[in-house]
Amino acid sequence: MDNSSSRRRFLQTLGLATGALAAGSFANAQEVAPLAPKKITIPDPNNIGPMTTWPPRKPGAIYMGGFRAPKLDKVRVAFVGVGERGSMHVGQMAVIEGAEIVGICDLYEDWAKRSADVVEKKTGKRPPIFTKGPEDYKRMMKEVKPDAVIVCPSWEWHCRVTCDVMKMGAHAFVEVPMAVSIKELWEIVDTSEETRKHCMMMENVNYGREELMYLNMVRQGVIGDLLYGEAAYIHELRGQMKQVERGTGSWRTYHYAKRNGNVYPTHGLGPIAQYMNLARKDDCFGRLVSFSSPALGRAAYAKKNFPADHKWNKLDFACGDMNTSIIKTTMGRTVLVEWDETSPRPYSRLNLIQGTLGTLAGFPTRVAGEKLGNGNYHEWIEGKEKLAPIFEKYDHPLWKRIGPLALKMGGHGGMDFVMLFRIIECLRNGEPMDQNVYEGAFWSSVSELSEYSVAQGGMPQVFPDFTRGDWKTTAPLGIVQ
């Protein structure tokens, strides 16, 4: 494709047809109907970037890195969005000691009732449901006055709901990504600072057993000084396009059609960023370059699986099947970030972290280094039998404490339960969250930055500093006991 053709194609995607997102709803894990016809923000290829400077902190606002809220004996939790993802959180939150589910909001009454049924079965108490439109969560906030809200609507609603619940007095815990634009991320950061409420993007992968163990190994210096990381979200999800009226595919498909970059970066990036202490005293995000492959798979899938006049076959899919980005940190370290939700290939998040003394990698779990095994770093230590001594020595204390129960509870191998458990534990003990609002903003900002870079032929994009320089004062995430 020549440059002029590529440019025309890009410019054609700048607008989203009115009502294109109207199929969205609170119904799915990350799903809500829009307030009004709303456009997905697509960067102008002639613009130098989304934001290369940052606004000053507002009067009365405080830096939230390491913030400790007053202890809560019992945490009253409400939910906005209880579809596939939100309902999973409901089932697990209902059994966590010290948490009480006090309200459930969703556009679909049947799905709200389904989650209320789960809570009643597990606890004997039935929470009220709120299903009178997309802003009924505000009525819920006024009536039940929750301490914390789990925010699981569609991406277009993350910013609005998250900011509203903080302004109405609750800590906010929002599904990934935190928001879809740099502007929205700044709004969330500012609201958290002004209200002095926690806002944590719920990156569950940081609580996986492998990820926790690698964090423990990195903190103990097993692989020396960190140099390089590889992160990814490789997950074939074309089948979601069959969710035409309700479900993730009913709204997410439009993102594949109208954007071109890494639209879902945080699952792979979150753990790598915390291994490296990015935005925590040692180092920070610097700049990013990004490239996308041709966009072929979604159109081919639509043609094969839907009638010729189906709405999916009327879309001109812009998002490359594979996006590859490289992040350069302020210390000069590099991170590869890949994204592909279209190609027929096995699932992977890569999860590779390389240091001066060795390398830890995922998919499959394998390690090599001067301090590992017999020191033969020319071969991986992999497989259940060979890795057993590694897990025995370096398993994270948090996983040792919670892991067995988490495995019984399920949720992506237990990581979901560990995450929710830690949220409640931190709120009850008045501890800082394991992931602060700035980390969620940095990790999520890769999406729009990658779109700008792709649109400009791979030109570098500077990360906004959501901490306004205060990352240098933020302690690295320790090894939680």
Swiss-Prot record:
The keyword Hydrolase applies. It is an enzyme of class 3 (hydrolase). Its cofactor is NAD(+). GO terms for molecular function: hydrolase activity, acting on glycosyl bonds; nucleotide binding. The keyword Signal applies. It comes from the Bacteria. This is Glycosyl hydrolase family 109 protein 1.
